[in-house]
Swiss-Prot record:
InterPro entries: Ser_deHydtase-like_asu, UPF0597. Belongs to the UPF0597 family. This is UPF0597 protein Fnod_1278. It comes from Fervidobacterium nodosum (strain ATCC 35602 / DSM 5306 / Rt17-B1). It comes from the Bacteria. GO terms for molecular function: L-cysteine desulfhydrase activity.
Amino acid sequence: MSEFLEGENSKRSIIREIFFDNVKLSYGCTEPVAVGLSVAVGKGYLRGVLKSIDVIMDRNTYKNGLEVGIPGTHLHGFDLAIALAYLVGKPEYGLQVFKDVNSHVLSKAYELKDKIRVSYENSYNLHIKTKLEADNEVLIEITDSHDNISKIVVDGNEIRNTQTSVNFKKDLVKSISLNDIFEYIENPDLDVVNVVKEGIKYNVNAAREGIKKEGNFGYALEEGIPAYVAAGVDERMNGELIPIMTVAGSGNQGIASIVPPTLYGRENEMPEEKIEKAVLLSILVTTYIKAFTGVLTPVCGAGSIASAGSSAAITYLAGGNAEQIKNAINNVLATLFGMTCDGAKRGCALKASIGTQMALNASKLALKDTNIPCGNGFAAKDVEETIRRIELLTKSLRQFDQDVIDFIGHC
């Protein structure tokens, strides 16, 4: 117990750090957002009239920005995102770099597009290199997480170089266990709970707004928790200018991990404090699993990873014990892990919706002690071992990322 409660290296302090590192407010898909942030930071060091902006990124960042809506525009494209970030983005906005986008700047953005070049390289980890040229030259690098400005170089002079190994962040998360998470949520810190409350407010609001709109996937599905999840994701992917609380680098994961336990708890008239603990459980389980799969991967995080988190939370709300919560996670992962990520887009709404339905089903099964047996495929008896196997299987899917880019945007 003392290891959990005391000291800066205690499990409690580690969970706090993990939470605040992985739960942040954003406008729009986080990959165009990250590119936009690099541009906004670079602009602050630029002198004179802009000549060019060159951005080279890892292939997963590129994949996720091709077909997703840019906030406030309903339009697609990295060149547009870069131009808008240059015009209205501010470094202090962080992942909210697009929050000032409006129709009046669109025409100016189109005038800048000829000065913008975008390409990608076969890097497995999140890595964005943005070079801006005017009377001087500025280089900005983002690595490992969407708002980690790791390098700033102005006219060859290094202003910042804070390279942090992606393995350090992963190892920090891997140093805790699901049991540590279960213990923490029963006595969470107040500032953590306050962020959870914000996440509930923003993400449920997005779902409620989306489900009202004809043409939205959630509107078409009509009712039920999966429909609301689809509605929120579709709002975001379609380019609505709405704030979303991200989880482990993804707004869709934020919606898929926060909305289901919230609506389940409220439908069953549970106390808000209990719902907040459940949502925190969902967030932390999702973040924990993502430490093994990686931030950007060939695997659909909203459909298969966040749904494991929400199933844990729903099982908790329904009175499940620790073993049943773990079995719910295992049931989801053993069923949906093969769902791939073929880029951020409106169709993500349906993947998240399917994941949510499975989260509900997995919880029902776990509560009746009816679970996928170990040895069925990659399912292990211990969910922690299943998660470790997923880490290995994710790496085996890397060829998918290389091939799928050729199809995105082509009918």
